[in-house]
């Protein structure tokens, strides 16, 4: 990312303030602005407008709109009595009247986000429009009009800014929620600009087609340029992005951005190291990125998160990305909720044993058409598998039985909603896994043999087999002594009736809904140590056959037991010795 100067650093120049008393002589005649001046229109609600800029040679005049004759330009004078030390001009105004401000000369710095707080107390909302750009040279437009929510540039705005000395347009229009266009004539020259960091961030109405031909050949940072510009859908495939290194969050939240023509960037993005959230939330994005040269990338997480239509027009083959992920350590959420991605070509991605990837969290989560054969993937170094295949409803797990997952720490939700899951994972080494939460939730046909799994490191088994209606696996040798959370572990496992008598439950705190809906369950769990359990709410609800003798259970701090045995038609254990004094 290109370094950005603080709002407190203004470089050089003098600090001025000019107080102009305004006449109220009005005329219907339109104002004739000085052709060299930067002209803006304001409508303040208070008694002054604060204009933060710095210049070596500026002359200014501020007057009520339609006033004739307009006052002469005044030489700005140093204002030294500002207790907040703001670098700004202040002009006296009458509330709710419209004013014209003309600034003539080169402007070294202009920022509506000046330090001290005065600007934020109302002036930003007073700026209505840029009437004319003038001929002065701009040196720094970082945050120039940031958060001016009423600012508009229209087809009648005269000229364009002289940016020959300007390298930084960061945050220039950030938060300008009324802004629709900026370059009505299509003549902005950006050849010397280095960064467009967050230039149009949160500009919810911005969609200027004239920026399509901007020459950004020297821009290095497109970080957050259009972030949350929800209306933006300009075809910018002609942009020269060959020097860009940072595209993180460039189009994040651009709900209407289709990415038309971005295939042309294929050979131009080879310097980009950061694709974090580039297209996050671009729900209508539908271009083919498979030929993009991503060989320099180090960060690619969330790149296509929630890109619902990606791959809708044709099946995307990502085989060209193979061998180009050598610097990446995480593929987390890369294609999350890309429901049209089949995974074609990704079979070739992780063939090198020495790759650096340690996280596959939710990489294909929500890819409902995903069915790639990942037999050849080396996942030896991966620690985080959380949600990897979550909601991949067509995925059958082909080939992953041979994966070496010995370094895995999290497998929560890994196969949630994988109704087609058929692969037998009995030989997986899960001895380091702490998080099994929802791992196989909503896999109604699950029948895998887990009897040899070493789950001794497990901290949470919450919802692990939630909704696995056919599951009745042998778990008697599982060491669950470290786990605190068993919430809904076997919820609606209608066939489950495994022997759990050996389970050591000394660390258990939450067993609520643990066997809820287990119609066949009647295992002997009378020897369980439940002294630390605080929540047993609905623990056996709907266990129609359950009648274990739980009279020896001892609770020290049981706080919830609502509906604990509701629907247990044959349960008749004597629970009079239970300590329920803490139950709320």
Q: What does each model-identified segment do?
A:
Residues 30-584:
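Negatively charged
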Residues 1-10:
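N-terminal secretory signal peptides that target proteins for export/translocation
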Residues 13-25:
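Bacterial N-terminal signal peptides
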